Regions:
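Short alpha-helical segments enriched in small residues
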Residues: 1-169
Length: 169
């Protein structure tokens, strides 16, 4: 992965491959973002033809919006905070169901400069949800706020791309 971030060749290539596979399969994606603040959706919608594959996105930056808009259980948020693997999973499921997409992608984590919910800067959880399963990955990323956010976008797109390729096999 490159450090150039959304709009970089790697990000564009990943997003392009995702859109191509979604379109070929007649499938769609919806995105729920916290620390990336819409960057995953922006990377996807930069690709021509994305309107046939991207249902939309929700930027639930505030913790209470994760419950209100994405059906993340309030109890989970109260007990664990927003930076927790099961929160990423619930966000991905929630956005997929709420926006009526084949796949849901979610990002939550700590971009910095300060720790959050007892988690150090660079702790990130990403998830991809489909009807039959939800996959969550925990990342420990280094760098400043911008680099952590850029890497999260690339890793999220790569996780979705991997899931799409599994469907082809």
């Amino acid at each position: 992965m490159t450090e150039d971030g959304p709009g970089s060749q790697d990000t564009s290539d990943l997003a392009g491959q995702v859109i191509e596979l979604l379109r070929a399969a007649g499938q769609t994606v919806a995105v729920a973002e916290s620390l990336t603040g819409g960057l995953v959706a922006a990377a996807l919608t930069t690709i021509p033809g994305a309107s046939l594959a991207v249902r939309g996105g929700v930027v639930a930056y505030a913790t209470d919006l994760k419950a209100a808009l994405l059906s993340v259980p309030q109890r989970m948020l109260d007990e664990h905070g927003a930076v927790y693997p099961a929160v990423a999973s619930a966000m991905a499921v929630g956005v997929r169901q709420r926006l009526g997409a084949t796949f849901g992608v979610a990002t939550t984590g700590v971009a910095g400069p300060d720790p959050q919910d007892g988690q150090p800067v660079g702790t990130v959880h990403i998830a991809v949800s489909a009807d039959d399963d939800t996959v969550v990955r925990t990342l420990a990323l280094d760098g400043d706020r911008d680099r952590i956010r850029r890497l999260t976008v690339d890793r999220s797109l790569a996780l979705l791309l991997g899931r799409l390729r599994e469907d082809i096999r």
